Amino acid sequence: LTGDYVYKIKKAVDLEFLDYTSLSKRKFYCQQETLLNRRLSHDIYIGVVAISINDGCYFLDGPGEVVEYAVKMRQLPEQCAMVRLLRRGKMDRETTEQLAQTLAEFYGRAATGQGINSYGAWETIRANCEENFRQTDRFAGNILDERMFQVIRAATRSFLHRRKVLFEQRVNAGKIRDCHGDLRSGHIYFT
């Protein structure tokens, strides 16, 4: 955070569904994030910058060896975040309806098709849920109550098995879209 810009760096981790372990992969995913998020925020996502080191000093798009990449975005005022507006009771009906209309149009024109359908397939969703439980299992009994973890896992598995036909119907009806994977009130700003 600089006041004018935000520089978002990806951690060198492997989340199985996203592998950021190499510099080239982090660059690729920075480029992907910029490309995908410009669909809704074209004036916010500026591009990808190289972070380099030269004589012990770090530079943005400067001289030296590239050691990292970052997504460069225009910094927005925190008081304009939807999550803050909601907490203060400042989200009015008109703003909510405008947001709903914008999102409906975005979802309506978002890409769909055979390659995208696989992401909404029951087996893919089930595998992703199981992967999440494997990755978070070590927190059960520590950060998250062990019993609650078991309840969440059982409820998720039960839902998936009860709704398998629904997942198949959604794929067959072309309802799976290339949209935003992390759209939530903390990521929506009204400026």
Protein language model features and the residues they cover:
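Conserved ATP-binding subdomain of kinase catalytic cores across diverse folds
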Residues: 1-180, 185-191
